Amino acid sequence: MARIAGVNLAIQKHVWIGLQSIYGIGRTRSRKVCDAANVAIYTKIRDLSEPEIERLRVEVGKYVIEGDLRREVGMAIKRLMDLNCYRGLRHRRGLPLRGQRTRTNARTRKGPRKAIKK
């Protein structure tokens, strides 16, 4: 099992799919990492040699990922909440931020229905 950026990658998957299990790496970035590391994207992770894994580690290390990225996102949200701007208030109340309707729908963001007491 290959370990990159503190994440164990599933050995039966292709490299570009396996890299997507790292927080902060999606489809596009995964392919860019493979190209930069000179690794074929359809190679299975179990078939990678140690030098190839090391090249992938170096390329992945150039990006903000995993814990650092989670911290950055959390701090950006906290900053909005501290500013008392509209987006910060919506975050604080657990409502949608980007103008979606809330009279109906928005159940994912608002959570389960609360019964109205009569």
Swiss-Prot record:
InterPro entries xrefs: Rbsml_uS13_C, Ribosomal_uS13, Ribosomal_uS13-like_H2TH, Ribosomal_uS13_bac-type, Ribosomal_uS13_CS
Described function: Located at the top of the head of the 30S subunit, it contacts several helices of the 16S rRNA. In the 70S ribosome it contacts the 23S rRNA (bridge B1a) and protein L5 of the 50S subunit (bridge B1b), connecting the 2 subunits; these bridges are implicated in subunit movement. Contacts the tRNAs in the A and P-sites.
Gene name as annotated: rpsM
GO biological process terms on file: translation
Subunit: Part of the 30S ribosomal subunit. Forms a loose heterodimer with protein S19. Forms two bridges to the 50S subunit in the 70S ribosome.
Family statement drawn from the similarity comment of this UniProt entry: Belongs to the universal ribosomal protein uS13 family.
The organism of origin for this protein: Xylella fastidiosa (strain 9a5c)
One cellular-component annotation, GO: cytosol
Protein's UniProt name: Small ribosomal subunit protein uS13
Disulfide bonds: none
Span list, region Disordered: 95-118
GO molecular function, one term: tRNA binding
Annotated keywords: Ribonucleoprotein, Ribosomal protein, RNA-binding, rRNA-binding, tRNA-binding
